[in-house]
């Protein structure tokens, strides 16, 4: 559903409808075999139960006619049939439920058992100086295929200053930023914040001190208020409104049918790119981190939207240590230093 606009723009409804049909038929085939087996058992069990009642009644009637059995004895035998059959029925139904539950539990367990690649070190502590200088000391990085992405990177960002990273696509700008919150771990070298090695900092403490505004904004399928509050779940409504005002999105929100309680759709499909971006900026305002990463936050916007967003970003960057990735000169003209990554 989140890609419905792409489907409509390419007029590929028939293709998606066919995919849906094929998937449904595969699901139906798997269920058909299951229900056929269960139906065979249920019908067989019902037939067996009916035959037992019939045999009991015929035999009981015969013995009653001979005077060897009373009507009360026949009723007791008939009741015993139900008592005998019922546990078997329950056992089979329970077996089916266990099989369904086990298959779901196995899938759940396979996800839960995945160990995160990056974890806290044994002696990790909270960040001591989140507003300190950020230093990349002889940093190198490569992915699992051993292809070198960054090779001996050295630079320092003074506390409260703004640095811009520019260069061709694929040069490693986003990778440099991703190393700071430890989305990846460096292959060699050292990254410090306020003189403290980021590997010695608890991940929660490290990442709570860093705000990230990305090009591809992800909004959850909830209300505007819930999406902004994601930056600080304990924030009051007044604080949420204040963050929205700083991001220049409050006036727009008030025009929505339910204001801050308006549902934004899965991934924010009911909002424009600029509106989603400003909500994500409000989210970071609410988080109020000392370190800010702007990863091509305006590259996908038109000029008019970019101007509005840039004002919000300038306000957000004030008095924060900021790393900006951008291709447009207008985005980085206020940076204290520009680094070219080639």
Report residues per predicted region:
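Short intracellular "coupling" helices and adjacent cytoplasmic loop segments at the cytosolic face
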Residues: 1-19, 110-127, 142-144, 249-253, ...
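Regular, well-ordered alpha-helical segments
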Residues: 2, 6-9, 22, 29, ...
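An intracellular "coupling" helix at the cytosolic face of ABC transporter transmembrane type-1 domains
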Residues: 5-54, 93, 97-100, 116-117, ...
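Helix-loop junctions and hydrophobic alpha-helical segments within the transmembrane domains
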Residues: 7, 108, 242-244
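Short, conserved catalytic or interaction motifs in soluble domains
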Residues: 12, 69, 86, 103, ...
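Conserved catalytic Walker-motif region of ABC-type ATPase nucleotide-binding domains
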Residues: 20, 108, 136-138
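Helix-loop-helix
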Residues: 37-107, 111-112
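ABC-type nucleotide-binding domain
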Residues: 120-121, 127-342
């Amino acid at each position: 559903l989140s890609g419905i606009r792409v489907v409509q723009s390419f007029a590929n409804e028939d293709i998606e409808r066919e995919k849906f049909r094929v998937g449904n038929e595969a699901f139906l085939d798997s269920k058909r075999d299951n229900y056929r087996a269960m139906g065979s058992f249920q019908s067989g069990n019902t037939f067996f139960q009916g035959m037992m009642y019939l045999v009991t009644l015929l035999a009981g009637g015969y013995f009653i006619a001979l005077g060897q059995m009373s009507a009360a004895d026949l009723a007791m035998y008939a009741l015993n049939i139900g008592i005998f059959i019922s546990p078997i029925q329950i056992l089979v139904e329970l077996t089916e439920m266990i099989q369904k539950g086990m298959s779901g539990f196995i899938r759940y367990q396979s996800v839960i058992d995945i160990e995160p690649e990056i974890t806290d070190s044994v002696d990790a502590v909270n960040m001591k100086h989140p507003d300190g200088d950020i230093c990349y000391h002889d940093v190198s990085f490569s992915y699992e295929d051993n292809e070198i992405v960054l090779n001996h990177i050295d630079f320092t960002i003074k506390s409260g200053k703004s640095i811009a990273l520019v260069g061709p696509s694929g040069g490693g700008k986003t990778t440099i930023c991703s190393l700071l919150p430890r989305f990846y771990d460096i292959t060699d070298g050292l990254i410090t914040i306020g003189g403290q090695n980021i590997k010695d900092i608890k991940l929660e403490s490290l990442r709570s001190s860093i705000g990230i505004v990305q090009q591809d904004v992800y909004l959850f399928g909830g209300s505007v208020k819930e999406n902004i509050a994601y930056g600080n779940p304990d924030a009051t409504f007044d604080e949420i409104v204040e963050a929205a005002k700083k991001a220049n999105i409050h006036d727009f929100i008030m025009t929505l049918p339910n204001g801050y309680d308006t549902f934004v759709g899965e991934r924010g499909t009911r909002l424009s790119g600029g509106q989603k971006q400003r909500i994500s900026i409000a989210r970071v305002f609410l988080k109020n981190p000392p370190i800010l990463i702007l990863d091509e936050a305006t590259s996908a916007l038109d000029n008019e939207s970019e101007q509005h967003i840039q004002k919000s970003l300038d306000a957000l960057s004030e008095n924060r240590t900021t790393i900006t990735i951008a291709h447009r000169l207008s985005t980085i003209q206020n940076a204290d230093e520009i680094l070219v990554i080639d």
